[in-house]
Swiss-Prot record:
Name the record gives this protein: Transcription factor E
GO BP of this protein: regulation of DNA-templated transcription; transcription initiation at RNA polymerase II promoter
Family to which the UniProt record says this protein belongs: Belongs to the TFE family.
Organism: Saccharolobus islandicus (strain Y.N.15.51 / Yellowstone #2)
Domains as described in the record: The winged helix domain is involved in binding to DNA in the preinitiation complex.
Residue intervals of the HTH TFE/IIEalpha-type domain: 4-88
Transmembrane parts of this sequence: none
Keywords noted in UniProt: DNA-binding, Transcription, Transcription regulation
Record GO terms (molecular function): DNA binding
Matching Gene3D superfamilies: Winged helix-like DNA-binding domain superfamily/Winged helix DNA-binding domain (1.10.10.10)
Gene (name only): tfe
InterPro entries xref list: TF_E_archaea (IPR016481), TFE (IPR039997), TFIIE/TFIIEa_HTH (IPR017919), TFIIE_asu (IPR002853), TFIIEa/SarR/Rpc3_HTH_dom (IPR024550), WH-like_DNA-bd_sf (IPR036388), WH_DNA-bd_sf (IPR036390)
Job of this protein: Transcription factor that plays a role in the activation of archaeal genes transcribed by RNA polymerase. Facilitates transcription initiation by enhancing TATA-box recognition by TATA-box-binding protein (Tbp), and transcription factor B (Tfb) and RNA polymerase recruitment. Not absolutely required for transcription in vitro, but particularly important in cases where Tbp or Tfb function is not optimal. It dynamically alters the nucleic acid-binding properties of RNA polymerases by stabilizing the initiation complex and destabilizing elongation complexes.
Amino acid sequence: MVNAEDLFINLAKSLLGDDVIDVLRVLLEKGTEMTDEEIANQLNIKVNDVRKKLNLLEEQGFVSYRKTRDKDSGWFIYYWKPNIDQINEILLNRKRLILDKLKSRLEYEKNNTFFICPQDNSRYSFEEAFENEFKCLKCGSQLTYYDTEKIKSFLEQKIRQIEEEIDKETKLWGK
């Protein structure tokens, strides 16, 4: 069985790539708040690179920070920590984002008419087909009407499925 930290790291990797994982691992291993400078020293990389990675992680909800002002210099000091307890919320937000994209795509499919090249399967909106006299830009073949009912049906099914998952998880986790 996969432990929570591995799941957390794998989720971050799938959303943000390998670049940020070193910073996330250091925070998870430390188990307490760390400054960007402490992380940079431990990884032996530039503080600016650490800050970029932390900001990417923060945008997706993987880490959070608190800031205090240094009494001597007046500069802000940021203390970072992993939000491993927020993994369900991160997944839920990701599903909501996917749901929005699927709904947008469904609207696009419903509001447009499409044509397809029988040779290379290039798909064109009515406007594109009209501008090109209903000929394929790649091979010059005559375009034919493309029925999008299967695509719309598939999108509607996926939208219902994700909405049900979000509803179930929202009730389960109270988010």
